[in-house]
Amino acid sequence: LTRFDDGISVIDTKAKTEVAHINMHNPEPQHVKEGRKYHYDANLTSSHGDSSCALCHVFGDMDQLAWDLGNPDGSPMGNFSPLAINHEDFGFPAEISTFMNMKGPMTTQSMKGMANHGAQHWRGDRTGADGVTESMQPDSGVFDEQAAFKAFNPAFVGLIGRETELSAEAMQDYTNFALELTYPPNPIRNLDNSLTDAQQAGHDFFFNEEMIVDTVHHCNGCHVVDRTANEGKTNKPGFFGSDGRNTFAFQTQFFKVPQLRNLYQKVGMFGMANNNNFLADDPFSGITPDMTMEEMQNHLFFGNENQNMGDQIRGFGMLHDGSVDTIFRFHNIVGFLPRPAGAVTPLDPGNPDNLPITPEGMEIRRNLEQYMLVFDTNLFPIVGQQITLTASNGETVGSRVDLMIQRADLGECDLIASHNGRGYLYQGKGKFDSDIKKEKGIAEADLRSLAQSASITYTCTPPGNGPRLALDRDMDGVYNGDEIAAGTNRWKRHCGRLRA
């Protein structure tokens, strides 16, 4: 199998030569096909043919490791990003927002979901901003994902040893490929997109504008969630935890506000040593009324050892450096704790007591964790679901088909059905169109009754994919059923000839 051209090669294992090759049907857009090789082909992109972008960004995702990729020979870079929390409001000098060339270990980030999310890297230091062009949504300055991704071109030389950077044309091809990568539906969230009681409580706290938790903002004030953001201006609208801004949050460096679609993938580093940045696992046991403030503070952070939580699945967890084991513990970080005005600087307004150090406060944190593990992604939970209806399983399968129709009616997926080699696309209002163009639509109940003669497989596909998958495989304007009747090839636009 040769993925770059979606073909099959026949190899003479003795002569070690290719003796035949044929291309297969591939419905992907041309820009995806052209850009794929720059992610995976180590011979093309590295010095020794042993490294590629995919070595760390496995299948465009993560390797679950942290890397210290600072450049001691480099120079500081300007931070031109709009700030969700501005350090100057606290009396800090403007120049501390500069991106230093040494940055410490940071975990590999996913390349999925970069479209419509602005600057890249944990710090947002890969950016199209130049300090002159105004940064405006959706695609100007720091919010220009195309320019941000192209800023990685020097990494082909600096990280994987290529003699030269990619040409402008090749880097454009790679950019087009990379910005198509999309997060899958959240696998934990209910298929009907509903939330459990704990998840709903966490959701409500997250969006409650009165619940200030980070000095000046509620959760959604920084980690913006808006499924329709820039709709009509980009082909991948929506913010899912970040609108592309940078922030000062009493961290060691300035960071881009991170998106939150893949937190469930980072679960597995269990347990961490006590330190003065996070409350201990059980901060309440052993507190006595006669403790001094200093004694109580020491107890809250060091009063008990964090318990062993079993075998590790990953070596790195949450935050930019992967140092925090759970989302719950992250919400126990000192920056979210109550703080009096003037505690950090004379201009520090303090932090209200909305994540209190009480049993009730711990429950809020647990609920937030539950919600963040089922965070929205670009695709709804129903996308990708498939089920087969037969003559004998209607009682058990029927409710799932009902659910798929219900979610398709809401626009969450394109629902297709396959029966005896025929394709059907759900059009709403209980009606399917068939892959024979002149046929009248078939009622949903009538289609379902066809399962008495042969099984029907229903699939919720990503929005926009239904017509190709159900009706016109090669998108040449002639429906599949019509091509079969005419004896023509419904895959002809995407198939090659056998060559020897």
PLM regions and their residue ranges:
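Periplasmic c-type cytochrome electron-transfer domains
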Residues: 1-496
